[in-house]
Amino acid sequence: MQAASESDRLERLEHAVEQLQKRNAELEAEVRDLKQEKTAAVADPKFNTKIIHDGKTYVEKAVSQPEKPPLFVQQRGSELKLVLGGFIQVNAEGGDAFAFNGNFGQTAIKDRFRLRRARINLTGDFAEQFDFKMEGDFANSDGLNNNRLAFEATDIWANWHQFPAAQIKVGQYKAPFGLEQLTPDTVIYTIERSLPTGAITPERQIGVELWGQPFTAIWPDQKDLLTYYAGIFNGNGRNVSVNDNNEFMYVGRLELQPFNGPIFGQKSFLKLGADALWSRDASGTNISTSGNLLVNADGSLSPFNLPSADERAAWSVDAWFEFGRFDLIGEYLQEHVEGRTVNGVAPTFSNFMTDGFYVTGAYYLIPQKLQAVVQWQYLNPGQKGNDGLYSILGGLNYYIRGNDLKLMVNYIHTWSDFRNANPDVGQDQFDEVLGRFQLMF
């Protein structure tokens, strides 16, 4: 028994010695690695140059530069979440560039590469049931020269979301009118929005709105069934510090999603929407803030800056159906613009009604990678006899990494009714090719 005990003890001692030797070897290896790292750091320091006098002449010597500590960023306030993001869109535009938008003849655009959007944004949430967004665009016109770009605010708003069915949003953002206008720039299927959308929708405005989803609390599984928006805005565009008069723009939208679920095993949904707008505007107000509406003498279009005061009302309806790889989107918009007398000054333009529509179809040829797009659009500006513009579009979208990295190409053919009826003013059909690279971060 004693011999066995001595044997066990010796075996344990030998095992302990082996473990110590192994650990010692590991420590020696770590020390060697640390020495090598230190040597490499000394061998490749960061230097600045400095001119010094050595008693005879001035010479340039290298002076070691201490490494800076890593950058540390922390929010000043008590936000629960703070997110920095942005995106870049670069266009190549050739042929009759932007002819679909009425840019031909006296408003023609030359072939170009274009920094379409370069935006950076900051979003956040507070524990007190507020969220916010601040976004600016480095690719906007600076208002001094249309050929230059400068930084300009796009979205600056705060939203109180204590009650999902009744939220309050204040600041500058897109007024709730028009499906295509409200669809983010980074996810629409065509490179540019349609002419009817640009001509009629109010785009970004400064104001306040009440909005919400009434079924969020009582029917959570169907919270998207109904969404409503009701807003009051200055009505004279974004980044303007004054209202054009003592009147306001009133905008409302209803969205209904009666179906969201699989059809024959394919992801599917149906969304319906309707909008309404009413506004009284002063002379000089641009009523086509994101597109062209005014018909020029040669049938081309330009932004509509009111020559005198007006009263206008607009409405639209839209639908979006998705079935597996296929999407079908359509929208119809209409606006009535009537001159009004203010302080004894009679209107200097004739009343008119403008309307238009677009229908867009999209299909993934390769799921989530390659998408084919077609679109038919029409705008009747309603200011001259037979002044409508038609366009048909065909395109491809290649999703390198979803919408984060995307390539797009569109071919657009446009017809001008006005120029067809008045051939002396120039050609009535136009062709253009648009390309886009998009990066989101």
Model-derived features: positions:
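A periodicity- and composition-biased signal for non-globular, repetitive helical segments
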Residues: 15-18, 29, 122-125, 199, ...
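Acidic-residue sensor for enzyme active/binding pockets
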Residues: 6, 14, 28-30, 135, ...
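Outer membrane beta-barrel
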Residues: 69-278, 321, 353-382, 387-392, ...
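Outer-membrane beta-barrel pore domains
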Residues: 107, 144-146, 157-161, 172, ...
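N-terminal periplasmic/intermembrane-space "pro-region" immediately following the signal or transit peptide
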Residues: 2-89, 96-101, 220-225, 441
